[in-house]
Amino acid sequence: MFRFPVSLGGGPRENLKPSDEQHQRAVVNEVDFFRSAEKRDRVSREEQNIIADETHRVHVKRENSRVDDHDDRSTDHINIGLNLLTANTGSDESMVDDGLSVDMEEKRTKCENAQLREELKKASEDNQRLKQMLSQTTNNFNSLQMQLVAVMRQQEDHHHLATTENNDNVKNRHEVPEMVPRQFIDLGPHSDEVSSEERTTVRSGSPPSLLEKSSSRQNGKRVLVREESPETESNGWRNPNKVPKHHASSSICGGNGSENASSKVIEQAAAEATMRKARVSVRARSEAPMLSDGCQWRKYGQKMAKGNPCPRAYYRCTMAVGCPVRKQVQRCAEDRTILITTYEGNHNHPLPPAAMNMASTTTAAASMLLSGSTMSNQDGLMNPTNLLARTILPCSSSMATISASAPFPTITLDLTESPNGNNPTNNPLMQFSQRSGLVELNQSVLPHMMGQALYYNQQSKFSGLHMPSQPLNAGESVSAATAAIASNPNFAAALAAAITSIINGSNNQQNGNNNNSNVTTSNVDNRQ
């Protein structure tokens, strides 16, 4: 703010002294705007006189309420200085004002920027959290999708397996595989090709179909078989009257001689079908859940049996498609360390060398069991005290036993203890493997005693008991041999003694056996 002094006297202010200037300067006090008319007239006259006298100077009379005190005074000069405020941008005060405004703007801008930064930081944190949630949700979805695919695939596999098993069961019930009745269980491949007119179903069960089927079997060497499921197998063990149903159906056809003959044919077919289901049971001590017999198995069922708290597991051979061999595995109720394995059926594929021990053992035992089916139940091989069974398997009664109580003939090989009085390593017919606990049969003794031949199949690279080209002749020879043994006690005793001497290799018994054989031969010559 600048002060500009103004002089109303018209003279130069430089000539005035400071004392004169202070004396001449008059201060305007209060102005009486409500004075009387006389005072106004007097003041106006005085002013006119002053103007007339000094036209070049301006005199201002100081007014006061007390006019008398100021009459003798006259002031020539009045300080009417003006305090002007300029709007120059270059002034100090304007610069201060401008600085304050700029600082306020900067502070406001900084505050806004800080708020924006905070908002952006919060938005980025929310974005990161949403990304994590999205990633976790995606991972959960992928895992659930994989689990769903696995469950669906597992269900499809179970459905496929169930469908395959049902189809196999239906196929086995409808098809009639080619075989020779009452012969050895074949280890070689068998033919599954059957003409449509020779196929039949088990559920029909009508007498004409049974008659037609039995006649086709007798003429074309075919027999009726049916693959058993775990339920039907367990029912078969509990129901000993399963086979006589065929006899009941055959009784409807009675009336004349031809119908009686056909009923006999039906009965014979049922008996042969029953003998076809011969089982070989092996008892061995093992801590493993299953014996290592060299084959590959798949478990398809398990159930509890009466009288045994241990479950019975059912297995099927998976080394070839459609292999009918099955086995049942169950722990002994009296001794849990004994594992009972029951084999049924014959392999239709080549066997590896590791599987030949058990396959040969079970095949020979089943062959011995089936070879005696032409004899009666009283004198046949179904009797545990049969001479032929004791001769072929020269073991103790606990080592090899034959059961006739089950609906299907079963022979049991007990490997839990060695036979009494015989050295297993010196027995040429049955050798017990110390390493695997399996039974190895001497394949050069049993077939010749049973009137059969042993063939070696080089194409399939395994040896087994195969069907001869003339099965009926072999069956007739076996029938003739067994009939001769049953009809001639002396010859039976001589044959038993001879076989015993050959197996044991005893020189002392060999002389006695020769005498007995000579006596038997002379008796036979005399009868002839």
Swiss-Prot record:
Transmembrane segments: none annotated. Its main location: nucleus. This is WRKY transcription factor 42. Residues 286-352 bind DNA. InterPro entries: WRKY_dom (IPR003657), WRKY_dom_sf (IPR036576), WRKY_plant (IPR044810). It comes from the Eukaryota. One of its GO terms (biological process) is negative regulation of DNA-templated transcription. Pfam families: WRKY. PANTHER family: WRKY TRANSCRIPTION FACTOR 36-RELATED, WRKY TRANSCRIPTION FACTOR 42. Degraded through the 26S proteasome pathway during Pi starvation. Residues 189-201 have a biased composition (Basic and acidic residues). Transcription factor. Interacts specifically with the W box (5'-(T)TGAC[CT]-3'), a frequently occurring elicitor-responsive cis-acting element. Modulates phosphate homeostasis and Pi translocation by regulating PHO1 expression. GO terms for cellular component: nucleus. Residues 1-20, 180-260, 506-528 are annotated as: Disordered. It is found in: Nucleus. Keywords: DNA-binding, Nucleus, Transcription, Transcription regulation. GO terms for molecular function: DNA binding; DNA-binding transcription factor activity; sequence-specific DNA binding.
